[in-house]
């Protein structure tokens, strides 16, 4: 995905780390042996799995959003339970959709929102919390990703690109 690609490049180029990206095929039923073998020698697991939320949320797509997060996380946890030497750290993604929209939230906010997105984030985090000891678990709640080469920025600029206003518009990234 978008964040994973940029994070992998950064960790490889700047940090000198060896990255083993796991594609969606790794999490299909019947792949658990291969997943266990892959995770056996990992020091850190970074779980950024999840289908994009910027599509129409039909009942079928809601199921895809669920499966791509909770089912994948469940399979990672199941594989980690099977490896002999546990990784030191697992970082598991979630989203600010966990919080109610009217609340100014920070890392200490425990209030959960209502609706599908909040329920999805809650279930995703709940599954990640089954991470086996002694692996330390860190859950990150991402917001909207802005970048000049992708993320939400490109989608927000599309309507402006068709108008002459776009040439006179200045954007400031803070």
Protein language model regions, located:
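Short-chain dehydrogenase/reductase
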Residues: 66-70, 110-125, 146
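Conserved Rossmann-fold NAD(P)-dependent oxidoreductase catalytic core, especially the SDR/UDP-sugar
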Residues: 74-115
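A short C-terminal helix-loop "cap" of Rossmann-like NAD(P)-dependent dehydrogenase/epimerase domains
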Residues: 156-169
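Conserved beta-loop-beta element that borders a ligand/cofactor-binding pocket
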Residues: 94, 126-148
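SDR active-site strand-loop-helix element
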Residues: 45-49, 90-96, 140-142
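NAD(P)H-binding glycine-rich loop region in Rossmannoid oxidoreductase-like domains
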Residues: 26-75
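Conserved small/polar residues in nucleotide/adenosyl-binding loops
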Residues: 172-174
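N-terminal Rossmann-fold NAD(P) dinucleotide-binding loop
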Residues: 4-5
């Amino acid at each position: 995905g978008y964040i994973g690609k940029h994070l992998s490049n950064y960790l490889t180029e700047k940090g000198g780390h060896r990255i083993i990206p796991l594609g969606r095929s790794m999490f299909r039923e019947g792949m658990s042996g291969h997943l266990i073998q892959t995770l056996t020698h990992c020091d850190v697991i970074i779980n950024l799995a999840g289908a994009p939320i910027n599509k129409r949320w039909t009942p079928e797509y809601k199921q895809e959003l669920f499966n791509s997060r909770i089912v994948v996380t469940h399979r990672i946890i199941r594989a980690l339970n099977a490896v002999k030497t546990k990784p030191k750290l697992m970082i598991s993604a979630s989203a600010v959709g966990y919080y109610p929209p009217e609340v100014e939230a920070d890392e200490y906010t425990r209030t959960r929102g209502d609706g599908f997105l909040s329920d999805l984030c809650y279930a995703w985090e709940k599954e990640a919390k089954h991470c086996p000891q002694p692996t330390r678990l860190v859950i990150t709640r991402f917001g909207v990703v802005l970048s000049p080469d992708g993320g939400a920025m490109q989608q927000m600029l599309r309507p402006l690109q068709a108008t002459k206003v776009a040439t006179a518009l200045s954007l400031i990234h803070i």
